[in-house]
C-alpha cells in the first residue's frame, strides 16, 4: 500500500478551490508512456502550471501499475530537477468499479474518478458514495470525481453512441448524497477525434467542419444549483485541423474529424469548470510527428528519432493549452 504523499503528489482539493476562484482550469493530460510524460512535465514546468496526470484503466494495464506508480514519482523528481516544484496529481480517469478505484488508491493515486453515469441514477449515487467513503477515510485524503450525464464517443474502454446532457435538477442531490469532490458534466463535449457527425455541424468556406456550440445554459444552471463547486469537462480536445491534415498528408485517414473550439474552452475555463480533460489532441500531435518522420526518412529505425520529435510536438501543444486556452500558466 502506497500513499500518494510518499510519491510527492497532491490531491485536487486545494487546486480546484484556487482554480474556481481564479477563473482558470487545470489541465488533465492523459498519458501512458515515457515520451508523453516528459512532454507534459516539461510543458507544465516551463509554463509554471499545475497538472493532473490522467490515466485510464486501459493505460494502466498498458503501462503496468508498478511502472506507472514509479513514473509518477519520477515526474515529481523530474519537475524538481527542471527547477520548479509544480503541483502534480495522479488521477484515475473513468474508473468503472469500486475495486478498481481502491486498487488505484492503494497504489498511490491521489485522485480517482468513479464513472457510474451509464447506471440508473440511484445506482450511480450508491456506487459513487462507496468510493467516496473509502477515499475520504484514508489518512491521506484522496479526492473523488463523479459524473452525471453521458458523453458520446470512444475513449479506451468507454463507449457511448449518444450524449445525454446533465440534468441541472439532479446535481445538488447527487453532490450531497455522494460526497464527491468534483463533478464531470455533459454539455456537448464528446470523446475521440470525431466528436460530432457531419450532420450535426456546418462547414466554413474551406470545408472545415464547425461543431455546434456547447450548452453554456446548462452549465450556468448547474452553477446556480451548486455555486463554487468544481466542475469537470471531459472530451475537450479541439482536434486541430493542422494535425489532422499532417496525418493525412503522410498516409493517414481521419475523415470527419472535429473537436471543441478553443474559444469555447476559454469561456468554460473562466467559469466553475476547473479541470479540462485533453487526450485526443495529444494523440494527434504525436501521430502527425511520427508519420512525418517515418515518411520523409524511410531508412530511419531508431525509435528516439521519431519519438523525440513526437514528444517535442506534444510539449509545444500543451504549452499552448496552458498559456492560451486554460489560463493555468503561472498558477503553480
Swiss-Prot record:
Binding residue positions for Zn(2+) 2: 115, 147
PROSITE patterns reported for this sequence: ALDOLASE_CLASS_II_1
Pfam families registered for this protein in UniProt: F_bP_aldolase (PF01116)
Cofactor(s) named in the record: Zn(2+)
Keyword terms: Glycolysis, Lyase, Metal-binding, Zinc
Gene3D superfamilies per record: Aldolase class I (3.20.20.70)
Active-site residues annotated for this sequence: 93
SUPFAM superfamilies associated with the record: Aldolase
Protein's gene: fba
Residues annotated to bind D-glyceraldehyde 3-phosphate: 56
Pathway: Carbohydrate degradation; glycolysis; D-glyceraldehyde 3-phosphate and glycerone phosphate from D-glucose: step 4/4
Superkingdom per UniProt: Bacteria
Function (record text): Catalyzes the aldol condensation of dihydroxyacetone phosphate (DHAP or glycerone-phosphate) with glyceraldehyde 3-phosphate (G3P) to form fructose 1,6-bisphosphate (FBP) in gluconeogenesis and the reverse reaction in glycolysis.
Listed GO MF terms: fructose-bisphosphate aldolase activity; zinc ion binding
Entry's family note: Belongs to the class II fructose-bisphosphate aldolase family.
EC number: 4.1.2.13
InterPro entries: Aldolase_TIM (IPR013785), Class_II_FBP_aldolase (IPR050246), FBA_II (IPR000771), Fruc_bis_ald_class-2 (IPR011289)
Reaction catalysis annotation: beta-D-fructose 1,6-bisphosphate = D-glyceraldehyde 3-phosphate + dihydroxyacetone phosphate
Protein name: Fructose-bisphosphate aldolase
Entries under NCBIfam families matching the protein: cbbA, fruc_bis_ald, PRK07084.1
Cofactor note: Binds 2 Zn(2+) ions per subunit. One is catalytic and the other provides a structural contribution.
Gene Ontology biological process terms from the UniProt entry: fructose 1,6-bisphosphate metabolic process; glycolytic process
Amino-acid positions noted as binding dihydroxyacetone phosphate in the UniProt annotation, renumbered to this chain: 192, 235-237, 277-280
Cited CDD domains: TBP_aldolase_IIB
Subunit structure: Homodimer.
Keyword match Metal-binding: yes
Entry binding sites for Zn(2+) 1: 94, 191, 234
Amino acid at each position: 500500500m502506497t500513499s500518494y504523499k510518499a510519491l510527492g503528489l497532491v490531491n485536487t482539493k486545494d487546486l480546484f478551490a484556487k482554480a474556481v476562484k481564479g477563473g482558470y482550469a487545470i489541465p488533465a493530460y492523459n498519458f501512458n508512456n515515457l515520451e508523453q510524460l516528459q512532454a507534459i512535465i516539461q510543458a507544465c514546468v516551463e509554463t509554471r502550471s499545475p497538472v493532473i496526470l490522467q490515466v485510464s484503466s486501459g493505460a494502466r494495464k498498458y503501462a503496468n501499475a508498478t511502472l506507472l506508480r514509479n513514473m509518477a514519482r519520477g515526474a515529481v523528481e523530474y519537475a524538481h530537477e527542471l527547477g520548479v516544484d509544480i503541483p502534480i496529481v495522479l488521477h484515475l480517469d473513468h474508473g468503472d468499479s469500486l475495486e478498481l478505484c481502491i486498487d488505484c488508491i492503494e497504489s498511490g493515486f491521489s485522485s480517482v474518478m468513479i464513472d457510474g453515469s451509464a447506471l440508473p441514477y440511484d445506482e450511480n449515487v450508491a456506487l459513487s458514495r462507496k468510493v467516496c467513503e473509502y477515499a475520504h477515510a484514508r489518512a491521506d485524503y484522496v479526492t473523488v470525481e463523479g459524473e452525471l450525464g453521458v458523453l458520446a464517443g470512444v475513449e479506451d474502454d468507454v463507449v457511448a453512441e449518444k450524449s445525454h446532457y446533465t440534468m441541472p435538477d439532479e446535481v445538488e442531490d447527487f453532490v450531497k448524497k455522494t460526497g464527491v469532490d468534483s463533478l464531470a458534466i455533459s454539455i456537448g463535449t464528446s470523446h475521440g477525434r470525431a466528436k460530432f457527425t457531419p450532420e450535426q455541424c456546418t462547414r466554413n468556406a474551406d470545408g472545415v467542419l464547425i461543431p455546434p456550440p456547447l450548452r453554456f445554459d446548462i452549465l450556468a444552471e448547474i452553477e446556480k444549483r451548486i455555486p463554487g463547486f468544481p466542475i469537470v469537462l471531459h472530451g475537450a480536445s479541439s482536434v486541430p485541423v493542422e494535425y489532422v491534415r499532417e496525418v493525412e498528408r503522410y498516409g493517414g485517414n481521419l475523415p470527419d474529424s472535429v473537436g471543441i473550439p478553443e474559444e469555447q474552452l476559454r469561456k468554460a475555463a473562466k467559469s466553475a469548470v476547473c479541470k479540462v480533460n485533453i487526450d485526443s489532441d495529444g494523440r494527434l500531435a504525436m501521430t502527425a510527428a511520427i508519420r512525418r518522420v517515418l515518411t520523409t526518412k524511410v531508412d530511419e529505425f531508431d525509435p528516439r528519432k521519431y519519438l523525440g520529435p513526437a514528444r517535442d510536438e506534444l510539449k509545444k501543444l500543451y504549452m499552448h493549452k496552458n498559456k492560451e486556452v486554460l489560463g493555468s500558466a503561472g498558477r503553480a
